[in-house]
């Protein structure tokens, strides 16, 4: 994803992986062995990256069976671009997640500087061209009353899936206009064994600046990792060994188990296949 804003270091240059960089990082032999590749921006918008389409085409032509996916706010590019993307995303499990947090009067509260009409036009164009679209909604106080309306609109527009979850971002990044929905309470701190989601699915995370990290949760703090994390990430075997006695706080918060599963497996509140 293109990283337009670095919250931790405003002087950091905007990052954009080029096709040539991706071909160097992921040669054809490596790509041929992959089951899935998807783009999701921790700090940016994947569709805004200059080479996003070319990178997806490279992965598709190199591995015709790979599953391709992308998470987006849907408010960039034009309808022709989204129609072309649908042609590239031509496998049964390919998808685009449109992160839409409400309706025209609420989506922009969290999804800053987005344009509702462009989101609708782009999503409709992608679906009409044969793409599989998923609607993902973060639930806050300001949009909690619109869940059913959003689900119905997703169905009417031809989306394949609708999902909604409560976000903790009003805690981790508190701002005055983001409040939790009614009745929400923070989950208990997990103290069980680490069940690493990334290791279980045998995945890695590559940031827009080319940094290779175990997962997107470490990627979310790529500009602010503490010295202990830097040491662990210099040797991923050391990272996994640490889970038995002193797991890093990111691993503890994300992938520690309790009697009801890990925090990752419990984060989804609503998940409904629409067609």
Question: What are the roles of these predicted feature ranges?
Answer:
Residues 11-21, 267-275:
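Short cysteine/histidine-rich metal-coordination sites, predominantly Zn2+-binding motifs
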Residues 122, 129-132, 157-196, 211-274:
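C-terminal accessory region of radical SAM enzymes
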